[in-house]
């Protein structure tokens, strides 16, 4: 991919606002990352200093934003082609690519060093690896080279609860790995459902998403496969004892519903039915992840508050 050099300075940088820089951070993605990171931090055993907890979450947020900025820098050519991304700051001519690169690298270094110096270096190392994985492994390599880009690249979005857990405990445990696996297995059906009704956009940008390379039927079959894998993994926090019965019931019901929506997508026998089913699965996938992590957070906060008041 060709990169602009001196000509980048011709951009109208003076017109860039704080909102434009906020867009570079991908705030919607950042909010999900912060939420799952917070759940990992609160769910972890023990008590963490509130100030250090806030610093940890802020560092996770800044690191996630840095990843988004680096992604927009490298993918500026793709963003200019796709309808849903062509108004981003670089293709819109608001911020120069070299400015975005500097912004992303600065935020990356700041978030990692702050987390390491103020909290612990294990959490900082996980954050650094997450930024590297998303910006380099996924964005620069996998995204443009294989239809399995989402499967492997999904690891980047699955690390935040592990980072939160490591910030609170200084450890990587099986419990935190389960949180990682839930998001990791959730990612393929979520994004493949999206790609099924945005196929033309990905085709125009020459991104080898599963529907464009392997076809719609294969994509639908694999979405169902990952949904079936994910559903029982989603129940593991209860099975392993670091979530309560309420979570067990909610995660089971939501997991079964997820499999049902994925099955409806696989079984669709016409294009209109397939597109409708893909949209429903995509929307429900958001509800699923938000739902189970919200219950985890609710239970963890409830148990810790009760313990603080000596109830048990």
UniProtKB/Swiss-Prot annotation:
Other noteworthy facts: Carbon 2 of the heme B porphyrin ring is defined according to the Fischer nomenclature.
Name of this protein: Protoheme IX farnesyltransferase
Record field: transmembrane: 29-49, 50-70, 90-110, 117-137, 150-170, 177-197, 223-243, 246-266, 292-312
Organism: Brucella ovis (strain ATCC 25840 / 63/290 / NCTC 10512)
Keywords, sorted A to Z: Cell inner membrane, Cell membrane, Heme biosynthesis, Membrane, Transferase, Transmembrane, Transmembrane helix
Pfam family name, one: UbiA
GO cellular component, one term: plasma membrane
E.C. number: 2.5.1.141
Involved pathway(s): Porphyrin-containing compound metabolism; heme O biosynthesis; heme O from protoheme: step 1/1
Known role: Converts heme B (protoheme IX) to heme O by substitution of the vinyl group on carbon 2 of heme B porphyrin ring with a hydroxyethyl farnesyl side group.
InterPro entries: Protohaem_IX_farnesylTrfase, UbiA_prenyltransferase, UbiA_prenylTrfase_CS, UbiA_sf
Principal place of residence: membrane
Compartments where located: Cell inner membrane
């Amino acid at each position: 991919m060709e990169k602009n050099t001196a000509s980048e300075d011709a951009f109208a940088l003076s017109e860039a606002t704080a909102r434009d820089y906020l867009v570079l951070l991908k705030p919607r993605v950042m909010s999900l990352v912060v939420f799952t990171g917070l759940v990992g931090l609160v769910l972890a055993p023990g008590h963490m200093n509130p100030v250090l907890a806030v610093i940890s979450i802020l560092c996770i947020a800044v690191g996630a934003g840095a990843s988004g900025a680096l992604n927009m820098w490298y993918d500026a050519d793709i963003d200019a082609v796709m309808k849903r991304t062509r108004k981003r700051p670089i293709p819109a001519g608001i911020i120069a690519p070299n400015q975005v690169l500097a912004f992303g690298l600065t935020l990356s270094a700041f978030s990692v060093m702050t987390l390491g110096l103020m909290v612990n270096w294990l959490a900082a190392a996980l954050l650094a690896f997450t930024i590297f994985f998303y910006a380099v492994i996924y964005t620069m390599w996998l995204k443009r080279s294989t239809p399995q880009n989402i499967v492997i690249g999904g690891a980047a979005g699955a690390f935040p609860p592990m980072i939160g857990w490591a910030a609170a405990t200084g450890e990587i445990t099986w419990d935190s790995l389960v949180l990682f696996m839930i998001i990791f297995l959730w990612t393929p059906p979520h994004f493949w459902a999206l790609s099924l009704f945005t196929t033309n956009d990905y085709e125009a940008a020459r991104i080898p998403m599963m529907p464009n390379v392997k076809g719609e039927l294969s994509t639908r079959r694999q979405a169902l496969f990952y949904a079936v894998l994910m559903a029982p993994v989603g129940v593991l926090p209860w099975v392993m004892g670091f979530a309560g019965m309420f979570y067990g019931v909610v995660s089971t019901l939501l997991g079964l519903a997820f499999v049902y929506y994925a099955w409806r997508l696989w079984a669709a026998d016409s294009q209109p039915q397939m597109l409708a089913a893909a949209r429903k699965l995509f929307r429900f996938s958001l509800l699923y992840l938000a739902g189970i992590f919200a219950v985890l957070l609710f239970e963890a906060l409830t148990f810790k508050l009760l313990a603080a008041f000596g109830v048990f």
